[in-house]
A protein has these predicted regions:
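Conserved core segment of the aminotransferase class I/II
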Residues: 215, 219-290
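Helix C-cap/helix->beta junction micro-motif
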Residues: 126, 187-188, 217, 303, ...
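PLP-dependent enzyme catalytic core of the Aspartate aminotransferase-like
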Residues: 217, 328-331, 335-341, 346-383
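Conserved core of the PLP fold type I
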Residues: 55-183, 200-201, 207-216, 369, ...
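N-terminal small-domain helix-loop-helix segment of the aminotransferase-like
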Residues: 2-90, 97, 274-277, 378, ...
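Conserved glycine-rich beta-strand-loop-beta hairpin in the small C-terminal domain of fold type I
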Residues: 272, 288-297, 308-321, 349
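A non-catalytic, amphipathic alpha-helix used as a structural packing/dimerization or gating element
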Residues: 52, 63, 67, 247, ...
Length: 383
């Protein structure tokens, strides 16, 4: 019913993912956008709006708001009030605004590394101080070192900046983990800003927004969502914050005033279509991504010197190359025809790369073949 196998030639259009390696035989599997055609209901809605031929000013309209509220309740068992919504051009904007209201200049924003690179820059962008705590791997999965979390929170800390589901390690944090974070936020009077942009791409288990745990944590929460990653429409620039507490919401909106533009009207059209009509496509996508995820995990397990954990969400695999003797694995793999994200950009120590498996199987299999061939060339005894 849905076609995820057709390879679309993206080299003909000026997009960031493929333009990076223009004219070079390097397969781009780095930045987090997928190589699939956008869901037809979204394309139809965009065409219908364009065919009106007039682009007037338009804020979020009632049917859009109702659709988002209903979708969040259906997908995440979280009933929100429409008044809690603050519309944004994207979640990166959203967590930068959150940092701007976290205490005073110089105060701390704590996040767990490795993490989506803009997390590492948002505190400094707003005059705050970045504080980090490293996630730890137990051999099978990444998680929290609670003693390290407690040690990282100090008198300066004003906000916990959370990524859930997590980019790049692919975790969907459990209710117990989220409860432990919420307890620390309440004990230290921290705002919790949670980037949940990948919540529609859960491959195993279910996603729980931290604000949905209870009213107490909801009152200190800013939850960021968007359809952009799930339906592959990030450049349409539309998302939203969910802020239950009226006082916190007013502070957030004041920080936005005069600086943050309204979402793109076509982005809002696409958002309504995605949440209203895009779920069959999304479910088929998740099934396809599960197959891709399993291909990646199996292929990496078969290559000596490389290892990865099984992502519970997203279309991203976090690959540990430290046992392969590579000083710069991202550059090494580029030299062998495969473009991956450099793990150092995520606040990780040297030796990690991130692979985007949101692509047709033909593309993925070629990428995995190139990775295996590169390792065989580096270590002929691996063959």
């Amino acid at each position: 019913m849905f076609d995820f196998d057709t390879v679309i030639d993206r080299r003909a259009i000026p997009d960031e993912k493929w333009a990076r390696y223009a004219g070079r035989d390097i397969l781009p599997m780095w930045v987090a956008d997928m190589d699939f055609a956008t869901a037809q209901p979204i394309l139809d809605a965009l065409h219908a709006r364009i065919d009106q031929k007039v682009f007037g000013y338009a804020g979020p309209w009632q049917s859009l708001i109702d659709t988002v509220v209903q979708s969040i309740e259906h997908d995440h068992d979280w009933r929100i009030d429409p008044d809690w919504l603050v519309w944004l051009p994207g979640v990166v904007t959203g967590f930068n605004v959150a940092c701007a209201i976290a205490g005073e200049p110089g105060d701390g924003v704590l996040t767990a590394t490795p993490v989506y690179p803009p997390f590492l820059h948002a505190p400094a962008n707003t005059g705050r101080t970045l504080q980090t705590v490293a996630l730890v791997e137990d051999g099978n999965q990444w998680g929290w070192d609670w003693d390290a979390v407690d040690a990282a929170i100090d008198a300066r800390t004003r906000m916990l900046l959370l990524c859930n589901p997590h980019n790049p390690v692919g975790r969907v944090f459990t209710r117990d983990e989220l409860t432990a974070l919420a307890e620390r936020a309440e004990a230290h009077d921290l705002i919790v800003c949670s980037d949940d942009i990948h919540c529609g791409l859960v491959l195993d288990g279910t996603h729980t927004p931290i604000a949905a745990l209870n009213e107490s944590i909801a009152r200190r929460s800013i939850t960021l969502m968007a359809p952009s990653k799930t339906w592959n429409i990030a450049p349409l620039y539309a998302g939203f914050a969910i802020i239950p507490d009226a006082s916190l919401r007013k502070r957030y909106q004041r920080a936005m005033h005069g600086l943050i533009p309204y979402p793109n009207v076509l982005g809002l059209v696409a958002t309504e279509a995605a949440y209203r009509d895009g779920d069959p496509w999304r479910r088929a996508l998740i099934d396809y991504l599960r197959g891709n995820r399993d291909r990646v995990v199996d292929a990496i397990a078969a290559i000596p010197g490389l290892r990865t954990t099984r992502p519970e969400a997203t279309y991203l695999a976090w690959i540990d190359c430290r046992d392969a003797g590579l000083t710069d694995p991202a550059a090494f793999f580029e030299d062998h025809g495969i473009g991956l994200s450099d793990g150092r950009h995520f606040g990780a120590p040297p030796g990690f790369v991130r692979l985007n498996f949101g692509c047709p199987r033909q593309t993925l299999d070629e990428g995995l073949r190139r990775i295996a061939a590169a390792m065989t060339a580096q270590h002929p005894g691996y063959a």
